[in-house]
């Protein structure tokens, strides 16, 4: 062999590997720190670092301060977070679409009981006069029930599909 190595012996043979290690004999009785305390300190510091990263990520995922969240301005959201912020968007838009309580009571007293001015007028009067303003913050399921049952946020329910929709024709 030209280079003096044995081709049958792998490179990671025991003798070859020990040539590159500097094994220093350590007497554990002479150590100032206990041998397990170093390992415990390592894992505790690693866990603290992971918790710190989690808290930083959690802080960064919040959409601004509470003052920013309660402001009447419209906030731009990322396109991938629309599904996640749907509940918050509905709560933000709810005060915009609701009438003041005094206005709805005044309209309810001025409108005759048998007359209807629109398909959603009685629903709007009932929901705005019987539910207080902060009820949706404490009971968010009421918002979904009102929306699904044709509450004040639903202006009109189409009885037939839009002109370009062919899904009803395909089912027939």
UniProtKB/Swiss-Prot annotation:
The chain crosses the membrane at residues 38-58. It is a single-pass membrane protein. One of its GO terms (biological process) is protein localization to plasma membrane. One of its GO terms (molecular function) is type 5 melanocortin receptor binding. Keywords: Cell membrane, Endoplasmic reticulum, Membrane, Transmembrane, Transmembrane helix. Pfam families: MRAP (PF15183). Disulfide bonds: none annotated. Residues 105-130, 152-172 are annotated as: Disordered. InterPro entries: MRAP. Its main location: membrane. It is found in: Cell membrane; Endoplasmic reticulum membrane. GO terms for cellular component: endoplasmic reticulum; endoplasmic reticulum membrane; plasma membrane. Modulator of melanocortin receptors (MC1R, MC2R, MC3R, MC4R and MC5R). Acts by increasing ligand-sensitivity of melanocortin receptors and enhancing generation of cAMP by the receptors. Required both for MC2R trafficking to the cell surface of adrenal cells and for signaling in response to corticotropin (ACTH). May be involved in the intracellular trafficking pathways in adipocyte cells. Belongs to the MRAP family. PANTHER family: MELANOCORTIN-2 RECEPTOR ACCESSORY PROTEIN, MELANOCORTIN-2 RECEPTOR ACCESSORY PROTEIN 2. Homodimer and heterodimer. Forms antiparallel homodimers and heterodimers with MRAP2. Interacts with MC1R, MC2R, MC3R, MC4R and MC5R. This is Melanocortin-2 receptor accessory protein. It comes from Pan troglodytes (Chimpanzee). The lineage of its organism: Eukaryota, Metazoa, Chordata, Craniata, Vertebrata. The gene is MRAP.
């Amino acid at each position: 062999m030209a280079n003096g190595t044995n081709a049958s012996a792998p490179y990671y043979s025991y003798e070859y590997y020990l040539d590159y290690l500097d094994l220093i004999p350590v007497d554990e009785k002479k150590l100032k720190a206990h041998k397990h305390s170093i390992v415990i300190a390592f894992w505790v510091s690693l866990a603290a670092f992971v918790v710190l990263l989690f808290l930083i990520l959690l802080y960064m995922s919040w959409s601004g301060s509470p003052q920013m969240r309660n402001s009447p301005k419209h906030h731009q959201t990322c396109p991938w977070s629309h599904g996640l912020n749907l509940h918050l968007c509905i709560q933000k838009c709810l005060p915009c679409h609701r009438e003041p309580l005094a206005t709805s009571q005044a309209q309810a007293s001025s409108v005759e009981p048998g007359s209807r001015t629109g398909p959603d007028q009685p629903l709007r009067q009932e929901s705005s006069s019987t539910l207080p303003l902060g009820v949706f913050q404490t009971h968010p399921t009421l918002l979904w029930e009102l929306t699904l049952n044709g509450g004040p946020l639903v202006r009109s329910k189409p009885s037939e599909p839009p002109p370009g929709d062919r899904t009803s024709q395909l089912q027939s």
